[in-house]
């Protein structure tokens, strides 16, 4: 990575409780914020904004969205008042054309997939941010292509952060007691790591075709938490180093794998 090029990050965000906790994952996020070059702005792709069509937050002051239930009041009292950037939102509209991108000026904001990790990386909430939605109607290869289109922003001092979980099966989560990962969850998590640097046509990429893996559908009964990874891999130039800042599987079937490009 050149000295001026921003990295691209995929962060396994896990439970909202990570906002309140100090653990190996939150410490890794904090270290990223302390050691990586400070971005001029951030584009976030979160698993929690899954839409028909593509949208981008375009307000001056996006709200903090508490898109979860049954957690301690302290979580609902926590806000992340990072400024928005209507200018950057318009830049994405132009950059992603001919894909139509709707400018969202009031409906959304920063959900816990975005602010839940950024509050650890940049606790002062002073870096302008926009959040890009994930179009639920498009195939996996399309999302990787979106990452390729976003890659040029990295040379403008803008960091791309995608947030999800490459293993995300809440039906099999061990909510209490036993925390040992299921063998299929470990196998799929390893499969992801083994294929991060695969090169070739997007439609043939093993991670675009993740459902072909024996544990793919069990690890991801729905695609929303897996697809953010493809934006970051799409922004890879094929030569940059790809590293893993932190890894682990919590509650049996929730991968906390994070991936850094550059």
Where are these regions (language model features)?
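A short aromatic-anchored loop/beta-hairpin motif
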Residues: 2-103
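Solvent-exposed alpha-helices and their adjacent loops that cap or buttress functional pockets
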Residues: 2-3, 35-36, 121-125, 152
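Short, basic/glycine-rich phosphate-binding loops at helix/coil junctions
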Residues: 9-10, 67-72, 122-130, 207-208
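Short glycine-enriched loops at secondary-structure junctions
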Residues: 47-51, 62, 109-118, 166
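Internal, conserved structured core segments that host functional sites
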Residues: 89-144, 149
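Surface-exposed, charge/polar-rich loops and edge strands
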Residues: 94, 98, 127-128, 136-138, ...
């Amino acid at each position: 990575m050149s000295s001026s090029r921003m990295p691209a990050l995929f962060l396994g965000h896990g439970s909202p409780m990570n906002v309140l906790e100090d653990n190996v994952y939150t410490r890794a996020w904090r270290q990223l914020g302390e050691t990586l070059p400070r971005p001029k702005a951030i584009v976030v792709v979160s698993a929690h904004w899954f839409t028909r069509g593509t949208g981008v937050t375009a307000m001056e002051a996006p709200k903090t969205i508490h898109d979860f239930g049954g957690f301690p009041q302290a979580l609902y009292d926590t806000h992340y008042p990072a400024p928005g950037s209507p200018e950057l939102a318009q830049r994405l509209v132009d950059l992603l054309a001919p894909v139509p991108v709707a400018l969202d000026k009031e409906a959304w904001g920063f959900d816990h997939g975005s602010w839940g990790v950024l509050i650890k990386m940049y606790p002062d909430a002073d870096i302008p941010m926009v959040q890009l939605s994930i179009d639920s109607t498009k195939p996996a290869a399309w999302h990787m292509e979106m990452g390729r289109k976003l890659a040029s922003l990295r040379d403008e001092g803008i960091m791309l952060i995608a947030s999800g979980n490459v293993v995300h099966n809440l039906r099999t989560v061990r909510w209490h007691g036993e925390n040992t990962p299921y063998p299929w969850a470990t196998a799929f998590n390893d499969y992801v790591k083994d294929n991060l640097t695969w090169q070739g046509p997007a439609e043939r990429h093993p991670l675009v075709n993740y459902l072909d893996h024996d544990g793919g559908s069990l690890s991801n009964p729905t695609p929303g938490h897996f697809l953010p990874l493809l934006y970051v891999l799409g922004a890879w130039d094929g030569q940059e180093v790809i590293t893993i800042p932190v890894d682990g599987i919590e509650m049996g079937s929730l991968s906390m794998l994070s991936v850094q490009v550059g």
